Amino acid sequence: MAGIFKEFFFSTEDLPEVILTLSLISSIGAFLNRHLEDFPIPVPVILFLLGCSFEVLSFTSSQVQRYANAIQWMSPDLFFRIFTPVVFFTTAFDMDTYMLQKLFWQILLISIPGFLVNYILVLWHLASVNQLLLKPTQWLLFSAILVSSDPMLTAAAIRDLGLSRSLISLINGESLMTSVISLITFTSIMDFDQRLQSKRNHTLAEEIVGGICSYIIASFLFGILSSKLIQFWMSTVFGDDVNHISLIFSILYLIFYICELVGMSGIFTLAIVGLLLNSTSFKAAIEETLLLEFWTFLSRIAFLMVFTFFGLLIPAHTYLYIEFVDIYYSLNIYLTLIVLRFLTLLLISPVLSRVGHEFSWRWIFIMVCSEMKGMPNINMALLLAYSDLYFGSDKEKSQILFHGVLVCLITLVVNRFILPVAVTILGLRDATSTKYKSVCCTFQHFQELTKSAASALKFDKDLANADWNMIEKAITLENPYMLNEEETTEHQKVKCPHCNKEIDEIFNTEAMELANRRLLSAQIASYQRQYRNEILSQSAVQVLVGAAESFGEKKGKCMSLDTIKNYSESQKTVTFARKLLLNWVYNTRKEKEGPSKYFFFRICHTIVFTEEFEHVGYLVILMNIFPFIISWISQLNVIYHSELKHTNYCFLTLYILEALLKIAAMRKDFFSHAWNIFELAITLIGILHVILIEIDTIKYIFNETEVIVFIKVVQFFRILRIFKLIAPKLLQIIDKRMSHQKTFWYGILKGYVQGEADIMTIIDQITSSKQIKQMLLKQVIRNMEHAIKELGYLEYDHPEIAVTVKTKEEINVMLNMATEILKAFGLKGIISKTEGAGINKLIMAKKKEVLDSQSIIRPLTVEEVLYHIPWLDKNKDYINFIQEKAKVVTFDCGNDIFEEGDEPKGIYIIISGMVKLEKSKPGLGIDQMVESKEKDFPIIDTDYMLSGEIIGEINCLTNEPMKYSATCKTVVETCFIPKTHLYDAFEQCSPLIKQKMWLKLGLAITARKIREHLSYEDWNYNMQLKLSNIYVVDIPMSTKTDIYDENLIYVILIHGAVEDCLLRKTYRAPFLIPITCHQIQSIEDFTKVVIIQTPINMKTFRRNIRKFVPKHKSYLTPGLIGSVGTLEEGIQEERNVKEDGAHSAATARSPQPCSLLGTKFNCKESPRINLRKVRKE
């Protein structure tokens, strides 16, 4: 620190002036960014002119000079090392990594061959004109300054122009790589010239090779290693977000300075680190947001300081050399750079259009006009001007500095006007009329939701005297995407290219592509949300997001499970290595032909295919290692030269004998094994080596050193035979690694299924077209069914993986909920910060323990399955009674457990395997009339049940025929509980079993409906609190029931059907009853609803419900009012129920996963509502 202050400041007395100057620059820069964002002159130019004005004014006032000197004593090299790392890392970090992968070859062609051609052309032009009368080294440095670009300003210039995602990524990637290569070229030339001046003996070839190895290859590898270490640290370390930020900030600067000290390119290394890191490298949403905001803040501060300091650091005497011809020369350089860059891109455009994602000739104009020059150019010019080495006179350095800075300013001003005009003329804005109409409708929907929320607040008595006219006026926003009349009426109808029929414009290809893009965006958001909630691992979310991003620009294509599988396999080398070992190295014992009929060949066959022969071969290989090691030690090689020579002959004889025996035993089949050919080739090379050694004329043909090198190489190839020994062990290691890949793939499948389920809840908001909506929904349902089927097969083949993943996932969910509860206690003041921090450390320790755990959890047995059924409540008496007549039933693949319309025989608990549930007659059983009118969704008639799930519960409770068929897709093992025995359990054990079964079904259906209809509500602590206060209530058929109470949250119909007494509208289960429904009446004999209420006044609520339950309805099954209590409380209330003739309470359990057909209800969305208490009118 003392050295930095000594270099940064002239003296410690300058510290107040420096702090005041930095604060002033930050304030002025923030003001300019806010108020002059659309000003014709760019903000960087204004900041630079302010710095220049401050430098000029320093000669008129001693007070101003005092502040200017405090900044000017900073070394340009230190200035470069402070601000440049922040800018380059932030720019690389903010890029679209997945699009850069698709455009990799295009960026590589433009950045390396294109840069070289452009650099040579600029150098040729400058040397030909020779206006500045410079030397060759100065021309080389000046050309590097002019060719470079500013990636931060370039990205900012094209961000809001509406360009396509591919073009933006191409421009950003090319600008970043061009600036990095320019800096490497500039630094290499200066280093080479410095060595020439110090009279060191280095050739140009050595400098070029050394520069490529150190600045490019070594920096690239070190960047990859650093990014992997940072990602590993971020995924395993649990701690404070502020500590994460400070440590990452320190690590990045540490990486930069380590690279600079050892001779690598710190800028290139940080660019690689920024590109390899992305949003999925962070553990939580808060941490990600803090880091992004922190780096954005640093980059903006660096932006303000850099351009203001540029004006201050340019010496005032530079302006003394300025003439009008210099300004003209700078304009000439600017126009020449544009022409040469255009010619370069035009020259390589045929190759770019073939190797990349897409490329258009219009892109060339935008790439030329979008190139902004700024910080790297001026920084290199300052480094040259302030260099202590001799690169020219002060006048020559001042000319290079002036022209470099002036060209940058001209580029910033002129390109700001040209670029938007060029985009509009060339028609490259990615903003079509369909997209604008879609965004306009989205904005209108947003306004409607805002106004409806305001309308609901009008009934609040505390806001009765508020000025609602002013409130409504304040929340009414002007639609920025409002279309004019021409845009609204144009292209209302288009003709189908196949049938020449007019169809709705909203159903054209453009609208379909827009819907597909939004679908992919929603999928990515779902995967990232699952990662933040620690449901998905970091590697799994990277694969899912990468696969979705890879389809972002593919027109007419949608992501499916096959594309994810191909994408994940393309990222892994384990599969390739295993195939290589199996096909090339590992020699199987299965010969294609049997032993020969000839005695000699049959004896050879018997000898070769024995364990002893193979082991002797391995022993010979191991023994050959010792002479090989001795031959590599020069002193021992001279002493034992004769012995090594004869030993080599002996081993070669053994190899020849082995090859002859194998050829005699296997005959032509010998040449069908790759390993045999490899061994034979090594043996032939050994024979050739002996021949060359024994012939004396070899000394006259080859150099003796070359002969020695050849011998060593041959001996090394011979030792490679030892690889055959470790090949089986390597296969075992790879197989173990691939078993981990199964767990990884299982996590991907679960994340993909959840993502598709999330998409189904927001399908209405993706598009307003009914046809497109139906197509998207069919596609999502098809993909989800395929994924569930794949998940079932994987779970059947590897049940231990499924149990382990589900267990660890649920542990993470529960620990996250514990964190949410702890935060809620802290906000309410129940617990102090110190106490909360101590408890949080315990939670983090548990999370780390789960993360580090490598144990495999075995699947549940038949006896253990019963202990995990919620409605048995781990009661030994209940379980023992059920086990009396419960039996294990196994079904073969393809067998039907039951068919649609069959009478229920009992409950099937799946122990292992996968069952497909399907409705052959979608209209049978449950009437979907109401929902089909309100929604344009097709009814889902297929589902898959996996291990641990239960089939037939609701049919046994209602004694209704099965409304779906169950077919085994694998061998299925189930625990079957007969229906009669289940009824006996209700009567002999306790009616609570039946009530808890209804409660379990109600929780499952309620959880699913809330997730479907209220997807914007996080599945967190608050939602779990709501589900812990649920009640299952019977709705009578002959009595109207009011729905109104301030303590109610939701009312969900889980079985049967009800009618809205006011609107005469029918709702069939499962359905979320809307707020517009104030009074309902059952229209079926058996109807149940789930009530979710706030935690207050629960006892009063239960009593109120008991009071209004009709006693004369004999056909009503005794209902359930669930509460959060113990089993003893439930038994006590059961006695009260018997006395009062009412219903009893039971313990509420956590909701189990409910499949779409497990409850056999297929109902969709209804408006979001606040629901109330059930009472009898």
Swiss-Prot record:
Sperm. Pfam families: cNMP_binding, Ion_trans, Na_H_Exchanger. The gene is SLC9C1. GO terms for biological process: cell differentiation; flagellated sperm motility; potassium ion transmembrane transport; regulation of intracellular pH; sodium ion import across plasma membrane; spermatogenesis. It is a multi-pass membrane protein. Gene3D superfamilies: 6.10.140.1330, Jelly Rolls, Voltage-gated potassium channels. Chain C. Interacts with soluble adenylyl cyclase (sAC). It comes from the Eukaryota. Residues 104-191, 325-426 are annotated as: Transport core domain. Sperm-specific solute carrier involved in intracellular pH regulation of spermatozoa. Required for sperm motility and fertility. Involved in sperm cell hyperactivation, a step needed for sperm motility which is essential late in the preparation of sperm for fertilization. Required for the expression and bicarbonate regulation of the soluble adenylyl cyclase (sAC). SUPFAM superfamilies: cAMP-binding domain-like, Voltage-gated potassium channels. Residues 1-17, 61-76, 130-135, 191-204, 263-265, 320-324, 392-395, 634-637, 697-704 are extracellular. Residues 598-678 are annotated as: Ion transport-like. This is Solute carrier family 9 member C1. Keywords: Antiport, Cell membrane, Cell projection, Cilium, Developmental protein, Differentiation, Flagellum, Ion transport, Membrane, Sodium, Sodium transport, Spermatogenesis, Transmembrane, Transmembrane helix, Transport. GO terms for cellular component: motile cilium; plasma membrane. InterPro entries: Cation/H_exchanger_CPA1, Cation/H_exchanger_TM, cNMP-bd_dom, cNMP-bd_dom_sf, Ion_trans_dom, RmlC-like_jellyroll, Volt_channel_dom_sf.
